[in-house]
């Protein structure tokens, strides 16, 4: 089940650079559901009491702010400072998105978890694989992943992290998450096989490379408009 879930969660990322606010995570989960085998779908349905992956796709953003899951606050990102290579990034002891995805994947693969804990681990995985593929979640510590890089989005003051987390999906189309999933879930079979064989570290490296391009194209005070999103 783990392999199928990870594969499905990467399909959207391989198709387009997508923002990861609530809708982005919903789209990711919707695409995952489209590619589950019957056996995996049945298993997940049992774990989630019939609720969909989409229902739980944003759960971790809220859970990380509760005392029970406060330890997961740093799991949503991995900071790579300007001038550093990916391998030089400081890996904090509290954990980061790459370590979390790797450890959760290993835990699910090993099996033997009580159903309730297995469901929690799966909810986390659904969300964190999405976070790992948003450029600003591999951003710089000095500006908190773009949160302190002030820009204007179609004239509205905001920050670079919010642009990529939330604004970009809505700029192109006012689609529902299900329509987004339908439109972007179009990888050819050869690409699907390549992504299926991928590993979390490779995904994180790809996101960091894209993040560098985003920073270069979005200096402090940048006016982000039609030429940026076209």
Regions found by a protein language model. Name each.
Residues 14-16:
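N-terminal signal peptide c-region/cleavage motif recognized by signal peptidases
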Residues 2, 130-133:
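Residue-level micro-sites within transmembrane alpha helices that shape
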Residues 2-8:
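Sec-dependent signal peptide recognition
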Residues 18-128, 135, 140-230:
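N-terminal, motif-rich segments that launch catalysis or mediate targeting to/interaction with membranes
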């Amino acid at each position: 089940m783990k392999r199928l879930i990870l594969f499905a969660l990467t399909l959207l990322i391989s198709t387009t650079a997508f923002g990861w606010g609530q809708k982005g995570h919903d789209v990711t989960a919707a695409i995952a559901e489209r590619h589950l085998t019957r056996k995996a779908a049945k298993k997940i349905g049992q774990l989630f009491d019939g609720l969909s992956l989409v229902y739980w796709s944003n759960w971790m953003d809220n859970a990380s702010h509760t005392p029970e899951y406060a330890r997961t606050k740093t799991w949503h990102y991995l900071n790579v400072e300007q001038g550093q290579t990916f391998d030089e990034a400081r890996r904090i002891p509290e954990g980061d998105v790459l370590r979390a995805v790797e450890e959760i994947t290993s835990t699910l693969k090993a099996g033997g978890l009580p159903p309730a804990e297995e469901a929690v681990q799966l909810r986390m995985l659904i969300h964190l694989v999405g976070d790992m593929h948003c450029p600003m979640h591999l951003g710089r510590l000095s500006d908190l992943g773009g949160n302190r890089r002030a820009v204007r989005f179609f004239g509205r003051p905001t920050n670079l992290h919010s642009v990529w987390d939330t604004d970009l999906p809505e700029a192109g189309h006012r689609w529902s998450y299900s329509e987004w999933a339908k439109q972007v879930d179009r990888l050819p079979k050869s690409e699907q096989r390549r992504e299926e064989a991928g590993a979390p570290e490779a995904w994180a490296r790809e996101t960091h490379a894209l993040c560098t391009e985003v920073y270069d194209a979005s200096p402090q005070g940048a006016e982000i408009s039609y030429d940026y999103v076209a």
